[in-house]
Amino acid sequence: LTDKPWDARAAAWLVSPFINSPRVMPNHFTALRLLVGLAGAVCFAVGDAPNVAALLIVTSNFLDHADGELARLGNKGSRFGHYFDLASDAVVTIGMFAGIGIGLMQSPLGNWAAIMGAAAGIAVALIFHLRYQMENRHGKSATKQAQWAGFEAEDVLYLIPLVTLSGALVGFLWAAAIGAPLAAIFVTSQYLRSMRTESPQP
């Protein structure tokens, strides 16, 4: 438990009452995470309630840990549940960037906002696809994120409410439009290295 990031520890505490429940399964939390995340993406796209959108995305990001913790602690994991979790992660993250881009089309960025959101979303889609391939070939350890003092890189999403409250969503979109493709290039290089070093199958 001590090796887990802070949000995963909190999620483990949240799901602990349901460990032995036959009615509450990890997929229920995954579905809730997906619905809440998509609601956040839609709110960003509408553009009238960015603070609400940010809170929904943060909640969805936290719930992303609940399904995995319940699966591990309650021995309720399944192959479908794992794929459902991965797909939900991708859909919510891509939807968030696309929603931000659409919502900012009325800003000085104009149509470029949608293009920037699409660029970030496509880059994220590529990252999820390549990480899925690496995990299938080399196990989950191949895609384990680095931690710093109990935080992971993806925890930056918890700062989104500060971004919306400070009116810095345009700057966030710029950072995503540049940073996500750069991250995709890095993950692509990891994937290609893993392909070159993969042991030949007997």
Regions found by a protein language model. Give the residues of each.
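Membrane-embedded alpha-helical segments that form the functional core of polytopic membrane enzymes
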Residues: 26-80
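A generic hydrophobic-helix recognition signal that picks specific residues
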Residues: 18, 57-60, 78, 82, ...
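The feature identifies polytopic integral membrane transport proteins across all domains of life
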Residues: 53-54, 79-82, 141-147
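Juxtamembrane helix-loop boundaries in multi-pass membrane proteins
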Residues: 26, 30, 82, 86-88, ...
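Short amphipathic alpha-helical coupling elements at transmembrane boundaries
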Residues: 12-20, 68, 72-75, 82, ...
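A feature for the membrane-embedded catalytic helix bundles of lipid/isoprenoid biosynthetic enzymes
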Residues: 1-16, 86-202
